[in-house]
Amino acid sequence: IIQQGRAAESVLMEIVKKILAQRHPGKVFTIPSNGHFDTTEGNIKQMGSIPRNLYHKELLYEIPEGGKYEKNPFKGNMDIEKLEQLITTVGPENVPVVFTCITNNPICGQPVSMGNIREINRVAHKYNIPLIFDVARWAENCYFIKMNEEGYADKSIAEIATEMFSYCDAFTMSAKKDGHANMGGMVAFRDKGLFWQNFSDFNEDGTVKTDVGVLIKVKQISCYGNDSYGGMSGRDIMALAAGLYESCDFGYMHDRVSQCEYLAQGFYKAGVKGVVLPAGGHAVYINMDEFFDGKRSRNTQSLLLSTRKS
């Protein structure tokens, strides 16, 4: 554990950057995602690598008349065809990891289906590439899967989360969202899994020469504190432990997501232009280009909307 998601991501990416630079000095890598969060994209660029966002084509489809979907279309999904095409084009050796943001933060918090997560895992592992999750809103995504994906209606959020996490080789998390805590984060990888195998070094006899887990642990301890508390107080750790359980409560999650949908539908019915539908589970987004009919400065239009009083 660590005190925030940004620190978790920083620790992970610093070690990935160091290992890749030692093995392949000056080499430029490509790292795809369904939608890189801004700090993830920044970390990748600082590595000298290229972030690629493989958004799903569902984003381009028209909203149904009346603004209602029978089932959530999972607009946060990754385009699997583009993923495989990218890997084969640049070469698997030039794609060290694949990221998946759950829910898809850059795409207005849109959810990612279990079927899509499963396919991302299949394609990444086909080419021996580790899959890393950014799971700030993992429970929220599991709620959307339960409510909209066939075969999950009778499963609990915790059961769905267990399956979802089974498909990743490593993950980072900001625990301030679905951890219900005022601070906290996590960085984790599967013990002896694909991430560990690909980023550890081994002697000729198969024994471990350099363990990536040890490198991550040393980095965390030197910057943020021992991995048993990660710079967090006992009170914050206890709040986080309770919050992770609370996020699995269906009633709570249903109310939270329904509030967003209610507000988004209210805007839509009132004629507000640019409302993103269906709403995600943590916010309502408005497309500023549509809202202002392209008449406002692209650099200030969002700020104008957020500060103007009616």
PLM feature segments, named:
Residues 2-274, 298-301:
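Conserved PLP-enzyme active-site core in the AAT-like
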Residues 274-310:
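Conserved PLP-binding catalytic core of the aspartate aminotransferase-like
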